[in-house]
């Protein structure tokens, strides 16, 4: 279907507890024998930029604690801030380098990316499938309780905090609403469909969309 594009990417956006990254993304990577990029992307962005991986990791953690993403936007436009600029190691530029790596990787390999606003970063690429995975709140709470061995209150706090961060992060870097279905090619309820069935369904869509190249 896309003869000029030998590789494909699946960009997964997910709510906490839905299993979109911790299960579905990992299983898809195994099925197709390709890499899954999440925090692993920080190392590649560090190598590409010359900025230490520790700074990327610190920025990744700090954004979970800051109010910045709730009050402003820095929509990604593909630009890179040069080393001589005082903003070279700003959170904005660290995101820019992660985005740059994602775009360049698509010329070298197929991969799964979880989060990182990858659906927006790769929005002009025809060889990308964007997927949103969600599930009812109570189901997600129960799943996190079992997965982490924690109580209901802790699970709710964990989910609420992480979902709020992801929503604000996405809005800050894309200017778009995180849960708008029109942002994605495929939207799945992992509770209604089942985690393994989600994997099989996405696998089938990949094979259909990319005309057998992914087999």
Where do the protein language model's features map onto the residues?
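Extreme N-terminal, non-catalytic leader segments
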Residues: 1-8
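Glycine-rich phosphate-binding P-loop
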Residues: 12-26
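NTP-dependent small-molecule kinase module
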Residues: 25, 100-103, 172-215
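Short beta-strand-centered segment that lines the nucleotide-binding/catalytic pocket of NTP-utilizing
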Residues: 34-47
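ATP-dependent small-molecule kinase phosphotransfer cores
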Residues: 46-110
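Small-molecule kinase domains that catalyze NTP-dependent phosphoryl transfer to phosphate-bearing small molecules
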Residues: 62-71, 151-195
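RNA pseudouridine synthases
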Residues: 105, 117-124
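Conserved phosphate-donor/acceptor-positioning beta-strand/loop module used by diverse small-molecule
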Residues: 124-147, 151-160
